[in-house]
């Protein structure tokens, strides 16, 4: 099958993860999945929410938003509308859950890390790009906290890596990492979050048109795992590179 951008069914879009995009944030990344671009920052603060105080455990949370012209038509800022949309809440919670899956709260100590993921340009897969980029920003923020002795020596707050990718069935063919044009044509689409050792954190799947069977589900999950494996390699390479 020939895809819109010439990729094979099992091929990711070109992925880049550029660290050090903010001079202020303890961790920052511009992540690109093809034409989808998300700016992720990680901010470290000493202390935890009231309900966490005295536990000796840290906390990680996330917020997600889109710039007004991230899509082909301008959307009002949610701050202007005076209400955060349900989709925004859902994706923010998804990003937070995904990152907390690889955090050792005790090792983090009573510190809070907030990930802010802002979509600069959307062409499908914004939430999966946000998770993948936010992990790298989180890793840099953790390293910063360790360097400032906010995290006790010898402790490792990160227990592994986490990344995410979209998969879907378009024209009867399972595809990896859908762009927007593929996403709107998909009979089935799914977002899959995996740890670096191949375990699932979250699987969000919906039949948009035709219901899917177990064989198709397995094919999509296999595609997603292979995609997340590739993303984990890209994340590691980004973290090993020297920031500018």
From Swiss-Prot:
InterPro entries: ExoRNase_PH_dom1 (IPR001247), ExoRNase_PH_dom2 (IPR015847), ExoRNase_PH_dom2_sf (IPR036345), PNPase/RNase_PH_dom_sf (IPR027408), Ribosomal_Su5_D2-typ_SF (IPR020568), RNase_PH (IPR050080), RNase_PH_bac-type (IPR002381), RNase_PH_CS (IPR018336). Phosphate binds at residues 87, 125-127. Pfam families: RNase_PH, RNase_PH_C. It catalyses: tRNA(n+1) + phosphate = tRNA(n) + a ribonucleoside 5'-diphosphate. Disulfide bonds: none annotated. SUPFAM superfamilies: Ribonuclease PH domain 2-like, Ribosomal protein S5 domain 2-like. Its EC number is 2.7.7.56. GO terms for molecular function: 3'-5'-RNA exonuclease activity; tRNA binding; tRNA nucleotidyltransferase activity. Keywords: Nucleotidyltransferase, RNA-binding, rRNA processing, Transferase, tRNA processing, tRNA-binding. Gene3D superfamilies: GHMP Kinase, N-terminal domain. GO terms for biological process: rRNA catabolic process; rRNA processing; tRNA processing. Coiled coil: none annotated. Homohexameric ring arranged as a trimer of dimers. Phosphorolytic 3'-5' exoribonuclease that plays an important role in tRNA 3'-end maturation. Removes nucleotide residues following the 3'-CCA terminus of tRNAs; can also add nucleotides to the ends of RNA molecules by using nucleoside diphosphates as substrates, but this may not be physiologically important. Probably plays a role in initiation of 16S rRNA degradation (leading to ribosome degradation) during starvation. Belongs to the RNase PH family. NCBIfam families: RNasePH (TIGR01966). This is Ribonuclease PH. It comes from Streptomyces avermitilis (strain ATCC 31267 / DSM 46492 / JCM 5070 / NBRC 14893 / NCIMB 12804 / NRRL 8165 / MA-4680).
């Amino acid at each position: 099958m020939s895809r819109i951008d010439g990729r094979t069914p099992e091929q990711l879009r070109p992925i880049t993860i550029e660290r050090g995009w903010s001079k202020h944030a303890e961790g920052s990344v511009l992540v690109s999945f093809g034409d989808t671009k998300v700016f992720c920052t990680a901010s470290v603060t000493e202390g935890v929410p009231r309900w966490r105080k005295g536990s000796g455990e840290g906390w990680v949370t996330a917020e997600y938003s889109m710039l007004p012209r991230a899509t082909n038509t301008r959307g009002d800022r949610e701050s202007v509308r005076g209400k955060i949309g349900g989709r925004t809440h859902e994706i923010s919670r998804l990003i937070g859950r995904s990152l907390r899956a690889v955090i050792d709260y005790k090792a983090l100590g009573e510190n809070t890390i907030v990930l802010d993921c802002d979509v600069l340009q959307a062409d499908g897969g914004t939430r999966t790009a946000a998770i993948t980029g936010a992990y790298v920003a989180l890793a840099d923020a953790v390293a910063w906290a360790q360097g400032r002795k906010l995290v006790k020596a010898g402790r490792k707050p990160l227990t592994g890596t986490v990344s995410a990718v979209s998969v879907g069935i378009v024209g009867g063919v399972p595809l990896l990492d859908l762009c927007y044009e593929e996403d709107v044509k998909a009979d089935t689409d799914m977002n899959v979050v995996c740890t670096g050792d191949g375990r699932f954190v979250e699987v969000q799947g919906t039949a948009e048109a035709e219901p899917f069977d177990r064989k198709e589900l397995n094919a999509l999950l296999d595609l997603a795992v292979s995609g997340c494996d590739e993303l984990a390699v890209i994340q590691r390479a980004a973290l090993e590179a020297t920031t500018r």
